[in-house]
Amino acid sequence: MISFETKTKIEELEKKYKDVLSVVNEDEINKELEEVEKKLTDPSVWDDQKKAREYTQKLKRLKNISEDLKRVRSLFEDLEVAIELSDEDQEMAQHVEEIVQELEGAVKKLELEIILNGKYDPNNAYLSVHPGAGGTESQDWAQMLLRMYMRWAERKGFDVEIVEFQPGEEAGIKDATILIKGEYAYGYLKHESGVHRLVRISPFDAARRRHTSFASVNVIPEIDDDVDIEIRPEDLKIETFRASGHGGQYVNKTESAVRITHLPTGIVVSCQNERSQHQNKQTALKILKAKLYQLEMEKKRREIQEIQGELKDISWGNQIRSYIFHPYTMVKDHRTGVETANVDAVMDGDIDMFIEAELVYFARRSS
């Protein structure tokens, strides 16, 4: 006999599968897959490396979706047979539980593959963390967040490079930027941008009082050099300085760090990780280009929101997530409502529950 809980799970999975099929058609996916494969067999496509790369990425994504659609359909067929036999066979009832468990993972994977369809979703990601007001307390919080994302990347098998690291005077960081290298790094992390709030008993307060701290996270994609963003030399203020900080093996200590200020926008980018001043300058310019591109996209998004009457002020009062360490333990995302009491796991990089819920939440909002 199948339990009530399992029946409820099956209903939820069937609904999710219907939602998937409402936005993607397997026949159309397979047709598109054939077209892309045909284009990649044409030798002339490789004359344009950018176009060839786009087709290759598209082919991989379509293959994954096609294979996972087949897998989910097959699992539902197996489930239907197992359910019919489960009333008379206890072992088959156990098999139903196993299929449902496998289906949960397969449907979730399929959902994410369909959602991660943005132009830059497959790209690497630059992730910056900035402390809010509050001195050492906020700077320590910013470093805790930085570690959380680095641990998350490690769990995913992604590579991490520290691009910039400015230590706080007592503890924590004044500013930090990392490059997370991995397939769909930007797609996964793009909704992590925003204000993150911490409530805890401060280790820096002798009176052991409760403190609230803020830090902002900003995520942008690593973009190709051929993106059409003009950066005029006369708009740049370029400074060099000695790299310093607790970046350990990641940070170069010679007089080669570069800080670039884009005068028209006030955007400041620093890089200290590369081995030479020239390399640091090139990396900083690459990040600046990505930030200017993001700024342009943000302007267009805001124009649309103003037309739709949806523009909201972005301020320290609009936190996307709270991390409560005292008087109880809870991490809660204020957009999706997802929460957990296991703050230690979250701070050790276990944040997929939040990321996956964000992706579904924003996909539904935009559909």
UniProtKB/Swiss-Prot annotation:
Q: Which family does it belong to?
A: Belongs to the prokaryotic/mitochondrial release factor family.
**SUPFAM superfamilies to which the protein is assigned, alphabetical:** Release factor
- Posttranslational modification, per the record? Methylated by PrmC. Methylation increases the termination efficiency of RF2.
Alphabetic keyword roster: Cytoplasm, Methylation, Protein biosynthesis
Q: Name one GO cellular component term.
A: cytoplasm
Give the molecular function GO annotations. translation release factor activity, codon specific
Positions bearing N5-methylglutamine? 249
Q: What subcellular compartments does it reside in? A: Cytoplasm
Entry protein name: Peptide chain release factor 2
What does this protein's UniProt record list under function? Peptide chain release factor 2 directs the termination of translation in response to the peptide chain termination codons UGA and UAA.
From the UniProt record, report the name of the gene that encodes this protein: prfB
